[in-house]
C-alpha cells in the first residue's frame, strides 16, 4: 500500500511530495517522530508563568501580554468586539466570500448533525429505567488564531460543532493586530456562525 503526503515551505511556494511506500515508511516516520516530548519543556514553563501571572494579576496582566505579543493597546474599554466593528468588517469583506462562508456553514452543520447524540430511556418490566441523558454545556470558549493564520475555517470548525450540540453561549478569543482590530473575515465568520461574545485576546 502506498500513501503520499507533502511538505510546504513556509513563506514560499516550494512543495516536496513524499511517496510513503512499505520500503520507505519506517525511515520517514522515524525522522518525523524524532522530536522528543522533552523539547517542549521550555514552552510549558513559559506558559505556566503566563497563566500564573494572569491568575495573580488578572486583566492587567492580560493587557500587558497583548501589548508585548500583539503590539496592541487593549484595555477594559476595548477588549470586547463591538457591533460597530462587526458591521465594519462586513463592509470590508468581499460579498462572494461571505456567500462562501454561508455555504460552508450549511455543509459543516449538516456533517455535525449526523454526529449528534440524543438522550434515550428504556423501561424494563420490573420498573427499572435505563438510559442516557445527553446535555450540552451551557457555555464554551473557543480560540481562533490571528495574523497570517487568520482563516474563517478556524472559526467555523470550532464554533459550529458546539452550536449543533446545543451550547447556549459561545465566547471567542482571537488576537488583534497592532491597531487593536480583528481580521474582518474572522469577525464575519464569527457572526455568521453565531458567536455571542468576541474578545481581542490570545
Predicted regions and their residues:
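A glycine-rich helix N-cap at a beta->alpha junction
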Residues: 186-202
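Short, basic, glycine/proline-bearing loop/turn elements
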Residues: 28-30, 144, 192-196
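N-terminal Rossmann-like NAD(P)+-binding subdomain of aldehyde/semialdehyde dehydrogenases
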Residues: 13-137
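Active-site-adjacent beta-strand anchor residues
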Residues: 55, 173, 200
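Conserved small-residue-rich beta-alpha loop and adjacent elements
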Residues: 122-188
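Short, Lys/Arg-enriched N-terminal segments with co-localized hydrophobic residues
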Residues: 2-14
Amino acid at each position: 500500500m502506498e500513501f503520499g503526503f507533502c511538505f510546504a515551505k513556509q513563506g514560499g511556494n516550494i512543495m516536496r511530495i513524499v511517496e510513503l511506500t512499505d520500503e520507505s515508511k519506517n525511515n520517514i516516520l522515524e525522522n518525523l517522530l524524532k522530536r522528543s516530548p522533552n523539547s517542549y519543556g521550555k514552552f510549558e514553563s513559559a506558559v505556566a508563568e503566563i497563566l500564573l501571572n494572569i491568575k495573580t494579576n488578572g486583566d492587567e496582566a492580560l493587557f500587558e501580554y497583548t501589548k508585548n505579543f500583539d503590539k496592541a493597546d487593549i484595555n477594559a474599554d476595548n477588549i470586547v468586539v463591538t457591533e460597530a466593528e462587526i458591521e465594519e468588517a462586513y463592509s470590508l469583506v468581499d460579498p462572494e466570500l461571505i456567500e462562501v462562508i454561508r455555504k460552508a456553514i450549511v455543509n459543516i452543520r449538516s456533517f455535525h448533525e449526523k454526529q449528534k447524540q440524543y438522550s434515550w430511556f428504556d423501561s424494563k418490566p420490573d420498573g427499572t429505567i435505563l438510559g442516557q441523558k445527553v446535555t450540552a454545556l451551557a457555555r464554551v470558549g473557543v480560540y481562533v488564531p490571528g495574523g497570517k493564520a487568520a482563516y474563517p475555517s478556524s472559526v467555523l470548525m470550532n464554533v459550529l460543532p458546539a452550536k449543533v450540540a446545543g451550547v447556549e453561549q459561545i465566547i471567542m478569543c482571537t488576537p488583534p493586530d497592532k491597531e487593536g482590530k480583528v481580521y474582518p473575515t474572522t469577525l464575519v465568520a464569527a457572526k455568521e456562525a453565531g458567536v455571542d461574545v468576541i474578545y481581542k485576546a490570545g
